[in-house]
C-alpha cells in the first residue's frame, strides 16, 4: 500500500508557511500509522519527491490537501498547475482533505483556458475526471456539499476530525509554564473580513494588553460598521510549529469563528491553544453546544465578558491554574483515543 499526499496549490518545502507545514505534519502523522506515504511537490527535498519523478498511478491512494485556485497577477502558478496535472493523470478515487471552508475542490482548467498562456496546457492535461471523496473537517456535511455543488465529480462526503493530527503526533508535548507578558493573544488572518466584526468586538478597545499575530494588519480593519479607537498590537506571522509557544506568553488565548465555522468546524487552532499555557477562551457562538469543553467559564459572549474573565484570571492564579488543568485534561483524554482516530482516518480513505 503506497499513499501520495500533495498540496493542491502550494509548494511544500519546510515549516515556514502554513500550507507547507500542514502538509508535512499530515505526512508525518500518516507515516506514524505505519503507512507508506510520500509527499509529492515541485522539487525533491527533505520531505518531498518531485511531480516529475514519480508516476501517480504507482500509488494506491492520492490524498490532496485543500487549496485555492488563484493565478495572482494573471500569471501561471506552477504549484497549482503541477498538482492538477498530477491529479488529472490519476485513475482512481481522490481523497480531498477539506480543512478550510473557503477552499473547496475546484478545477483549474476553467480559470486557465482564457489566459494568454493557456496554449501551454490542454484541457486533457488539467481536467480532473477521477471521482473525489471530500473528507470534511466540519461536522455539518450540508455545508461541505453546498461548497462543492458546482463540481460534478465530487461524489462522497465524510466527516473526520482532521485537525487533531497535531496532538496525535508521537512528539507532541504540552507547553510548559511560561512567564506572562500579555493579557490576551489571538492568531489568525483577516479572512477577507469574514470575522472582522468578531475581531473588533473581542480584540479592539478592551483596555487589555492584546497581541494579534498572523498575517492580518491593522489597516485592514476599516469597515465603518465596526468602528474602533484602539487596536491590539499586530506582530506578524510566525512559524506554524511555534503557535502553542506563542500563545503561552498570554494569560488567555481567544478562539473565534464565522457563520460557516460556528458549531461546525473545530479548528487546529483550538488544539494548539488548548495545549498552550494560556487559558482558552471561546466565543460562545463558535461552539454553542460546548462540544469543546463542557464548562461555561471557558466561553464569552462579548467584549465585556472577555474583559471580566481575563481580569478574574489575572487576579486569581488559583483559577487560572484550575482552568489550565481542565483544558489540558480534556486534551489528554482526546490524545488517549489516538488509536481510534487513526482507525477512523484509515476508514475515511477506504483502507
From Swiss-Prot:
<comment type="function">
    <text>Catalyzes the transfer of glucose from uridine diphosphoglucose to 5-hydroxymethyl cytosine of T4 DNA to yield glucosyl 5-hydroxymethyl cytosine (glc-HMC). This DNA process seems to occur immediately after DNA synthesis since the DNA alpha-glucosyltransferase interacts with the clamp protein gp45. The glc-HMC modification protects the phage genome against its own nucleases and the host restriction endonuclease system. The glc-HMC modification also protects against the host CRISPR-Cas9 defense system.</text>
</comment>
<protein>
    <recommendedName>
        <fullName>DNA beta-glucosyltransferase</fullName>
        <ecNumber>2.4.1.27</ecNumber>
    </recommendedName>
</protein>
<dbReference type="GO" id="GO:0052170">
    <property type="term" value="P:symbiont-mediated suppression of host innate immune response"/>
</dbReference>
<dbReference type="InterPro" id="IPR015281">
    <property type="entry name" value="Phage_Bgt"/>
</dbReference>
<keyword id="KW-0808">Transferase</keyword>
<dbReference type="GO" id="GO:0099018">
    <property type="term" value="P:symbiont-mediated evasion of host restriction-modification system"/>
</dbReference>
<dbReference type="GO" id="GO:0033821">
    <property type="term" value="F:DNA beta-glucosyltransferase activity"/>
</dbReference>
<comment type="pathway">
    <text>Genetic information processing; DNA modification.</text>
</comment>
<keyword id="KW-1090">Inhibition of host innate immune response by virus</keyword>
<comment type="subunit">
    <text>Monomer.</text>
</comment>
<keyword id="KW-0945">Host-virus interaction</keyword>
<keyword id="KW-0328">Glycosyltransferase</keyword>
<dbReference type="GO" id="GO:0006304">
    <property type="term" value="P:DNA modification"/>
</dbReference>
<keyword id="KW-1258">Restriction-modification system evasion by virus</keyword>
<dbReference type="Pfam" id="PF09198">
    <property type="entry name" value="T4-Gluco-transf"/>
</dbReference>
<keyword id="KW-0899">Viral immunoevasion</keyword>
Amino acid at each position: 500500500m503506497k499513499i501520495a499526499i500533495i498540496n493542491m496549490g502550494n509548494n511544500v518545502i519546510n515549516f515556514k508557511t502554513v500550507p507547507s507545514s500542514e502538509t508535512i505534519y499530515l505526512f508525518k502523522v500518516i507515516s506514524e500509522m505505519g503507512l507508506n506515504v510520500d509527499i509529492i511537490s515541485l522539487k525533491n527535498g527533505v520531505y518531498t519527491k518531485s511531480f516529475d519523478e514519480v508516476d501517480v498511478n504507482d500509488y494506491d491512494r492520492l490524498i490532496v490537501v485543500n487549496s485555492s485556485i488563484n493565478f495572482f497577477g494573471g500569471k501561471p502558478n506552477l504549484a497549482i498547475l503541477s498538482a492538477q496535472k498530477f491529479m488529472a493523470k490519476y485513475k482512481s478515487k481522490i481523497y480531498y482533505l477539506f480543512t478550510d471552508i473557503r477552499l473547496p475542490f475546484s478545477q483549474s482548467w476553467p480559470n486557465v483556458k482564457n489566459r494568454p498562456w493557456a496554449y501551454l496546457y490542454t484541457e486533457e492535461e488539467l481536467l480532473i475526471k477521477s471521482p473525489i471523496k471530500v473528507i470534511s473537517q466540519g461536522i455539518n456535511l450540508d455545508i461541505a456539499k453546498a461548497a462543492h455543488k458546482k463540481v460534478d465529480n465530487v461524489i462522497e462526503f465524510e466527516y473526520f476530525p482532521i485537525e487533531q493530527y497535531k496532538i496525535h503526533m508521537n512528539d507532541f508535548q504540552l507547553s510548559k509554564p511560561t512567564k506572562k507578558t500579555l493579557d490576551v493573544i489571538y492568531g489568525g488572518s483577516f479572512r477577507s473580513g469574514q470575522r472582522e466584526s468578531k475581531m473588533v468586538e473581542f480584540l479592539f478597545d478592551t483596555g487589555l494588553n492584546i497581541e494579534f499575530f498572523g498575517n492580518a494588519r491593522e489597516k485592514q480593519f476599516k469597515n465603518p460598521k465596526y468602528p474602533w479607537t484602539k487596536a491590539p498590537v499586530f506582530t506578524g506571522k510566525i512559524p506554524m510549529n511555534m503557535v502553542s509557544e506563542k500563545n503561552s506568553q498570554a494569560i488567555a488565548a481567544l478562539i473565534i469563528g464565522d457563520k460557516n465555522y460556528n458549531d461546525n468546524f473545530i479548528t487546529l487552532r483550538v488544539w494548539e491553544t488548548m495545549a498552550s499555557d494560556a487559558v482558552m477562551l471561546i466565543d460562545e457562538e463558535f461552539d454553542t453546544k460546548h462540544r469543546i469543553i463542557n464548562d461555561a467559564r471557558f466561553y464569552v459572549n462579548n467584549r465585556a465578558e472577555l474583559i471580566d474573565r481575563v481580569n478574574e484570571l489575572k487576579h486569581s492564579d488559583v483559577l487560572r491554574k484550575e482552568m489550565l488543568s481542565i483544558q489540558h485534561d480534556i486534551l489528554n483524554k482526546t490524545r488517549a483515543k489516538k488509536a481510534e482516530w487513526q482507525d477512523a482516518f484509515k476508514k475515511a480513505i477506504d483502507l
